[in-house]
Amino acid sequence: MIIGVVSDTHLREGRVKLPAKLMEAFREVDHILHLGDWMTLEVYDQLSKLAPVDGIAGNNDGYEIIERFGEKKILSFEGVRIGLVHGHEPYSSRITTPQKARKAFEGEPVSCILFGHSHQPYLQMDDGVLMFNPGSPTDKRREKLYSFGLLEIRGGQVLPRHVFYEDKG
């Protein structure tokens, strides 16, 4: 099973055009997970034409997105429990976004935590839990490249990778 992972699209209503590189890659996935800051459900509409979509809301999402997706969840794919959280809470500059994401699932059995918020691609193991941030496909901030993620789940293993590109067109 291949899961497309995206976060921080930050697209405004009526101006939704997801990058061609992302759309092309997500045509081949079995499921898509969005980790917040959709900004409009038009992003959901575009992605859901490619594969089933789930996700969570981020700190820039409105009531409609929060109501539809919630702000934290655990999903299971082929027996692998995956935690989804945006990564902005608790509001504190004393801990990093990965630390906030990890803290959100403290005491909960998950194999992998997917998070966004920082727009920074991230891939690390933390005490046996895979921590993965896909970066942003549309708003790279200080990063050199735009990015999204792909997770392959095979035999109970999660095999993550980032997809990087220069042009968001």
Role assignments for model-derived ranges:
Residues 2-10, 81-88, 129-135, 160-162:
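Active-site-proximal beta-strand elements of phosphoester/diester hydrolases
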Residues 54, 93-162:
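Conserved beta-sheet core of the metallophosphoesterase superfamily
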Residues 1-53, 62-71, 79, 144-147, ...:
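N-terminal active-site segment of His-dependent metallophosphoesterases
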Residues 11, 40, 89, 120, ...:
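Short active-site segment of divalent metal-dependent hydrolases/proteases
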Residues 20-24, 43-46, 72-73, 101-104, ...:
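Short, flexible, glycine/charge-rich loop motifs used to bind or transfer phosphoryl groups or to couple energy/partner
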